[in-house]
Every structure is written in structure tokens, then in C-alpha cells.
Amino acid sequence: MNILIANDDGVFAPGIQALADALKPLGRVVVVAPESERSGFSSALTLDRPLRPIQIAEDVWAVNGTPADCVYLSMNGLFDFEFDLVVSGINSGANLGDDVLYSGTVGAAFEGRLMKQPAIAVSLAGPDVRSYDHKDDYAQAAKWVHDFIAKGLPALPPRHIFNINIPDVPQLKGTQITYQGRRAQSKPITSHVDPRGRQVYWIGLAGEAVTDPQRIASQIQSDFFAVANSFVSVTPIQMDATNYAVLEDLQASLG
């Protein structure tokens, strides 16, 4: 099996190094990732300048572009062979609820949505993960991803991917299939004056998780709930954002 690994934390991030090491027993692993951090780029592609992939080690490439650029290049001519699976991560920080709209980790996985197997976006969730600087800090999460793939990935409809969040806890309680939760409104922007006397702004922190009432008949909970309770969250998400439930009513209202 040929496995493509990308991320949004950059090619030298410890999370992607741990993931590559863990997946090598499953086949050929090729890392193609941004040359520096590109968090928050979602599915953005670079269309206004050339991209420059540079091989920095055997089967490791750095690209002066976005996470989605890395996967797009890899699937469309950078290599003379095809990939069977795209795995994006391991991200330093959670990608839960509304965060998937902004996530470069998820965006890279969505570029692999038409592969032979469902693409995977994987993130390590916890308050301390952004300070981790060694691949051993991601070892438990990387092993979980290895085992998840080795067992055989569950089938998904076309153009769907797995968004996986692994809590950073000493002992995982298990795995839960989850739905995408949501956040309250983001915190307000903050204003500062830089050393040159110019007004600058920081985008506010993400809003707190919202506890939705149970939306489906089974006991399936949100991704926030699973991670908060030390379970790995596995959420199937799709590229098609159409709300089919309201199509006919909307059509009637315009008729």
C-alpha cells in the first residue's frame, strides 16, 4: 500500500514524523508537507505563483504551499505511482465541531477524498499539545492510527473522509463514532498597537463547545463529548455541504 502523509504544521513537525514512523509497517509512506506551518488554510490551493517541491530526505518532500497543495501535487503528477490512502496529521491541537471549516489538516484530507480508501484527518487534542516538540509525544496517537488502518478501514460513501480526534490522556477509554459538534460564537477580536505605532488586531479565540440536545435516536454523541471523556472521536464528514432536508421547502417557498 502506498500512503501519502500531509499536514498543516509543517514537514518538520513532530506529529507528522511520529505518524510516518508508525505507518511504515503498512507499506510505502511518502511525506509531502508544507515547508513551514500553514494552519488555518482549510482547502486553499495556491493559484497565483508556482509551487516548488523539494526532496529533503528519502520519501520526504517540503512544499512552499498549503496543505491541500501538497496533496494535489502528489496526486496529480509529482510521482510516477498512485497512492492508495491519504492521511493528514497528526495535528497539534484538536479539530472539533466548526473548526473543521478552517482546518488545514482536514483540508488536506479532503483533497484525498477520491482515493481507493477514505482519507483520514487526525489530530491530538489536549491543553498541552502545542508545546510538544518531540515525536514521542505523539506515539500513542500514531499507534492508534496504525491500528485503525491495519484492521481495515470502514467503508464510507464517495467524497467522505474520517475526521479523527485523539485525546492526549495517559489511557484512552476507547473509540466512539461521533457527529460534528458546534461552538458558540468566537471571542471578539483584540486590538493592539505595534512598536511602529500601527493598529493591529488578533482574531479572537474559538468559542466554547455547545452541548446540543440529542439529535439522533441512537446514543451517538458529539466529537466534543467523546474527547472530553477520553474517547477517540471518529466522525465521518463529507465535501457536499448541501442541506437536503430543506431543499423542497425552500423550493416551494420560492415558487
UniProtKB/Swiss-Prot annotation:
It holds the Pfam family SurE. It comes from the Bacteria. Keywords: Cytoplasm, Hydrolase, Metal-binding, Nucleotide-binding. It is found in: Cytoplasm. A divalent metal cation binds at residues 8-9, 39, 91. Its main location: cytoplasm. Its EC number is 3.1.3.5. It catalyses: a ribonucleoside 5'-phosphate + H2O = a ribonucleoside + phosphate. InterPro entries: SurE, SurE-like_Pase/nucleotidase, SurE-like_sf. SUPFAM superfamilies: SurE-like. Its cofactor is a divalent metal cation. Binds 1 divalent metal cation per subunit. GO terms for cellular component: cytoplasm. One of its GO terms (molecular function) is nucleotide binding. Nucleotidase that shows phosphatase activity on nucleoside 5'-monophosphates. Belongs to the SurE nucleotidase family. This is 5'-nucleotidase SurE. It comes from Acinetobacter baumannii (strain ATCC 17978 / DSM 105126 / CIP 53.77 / LMG 1025 / NCDC KC755 / 5377).
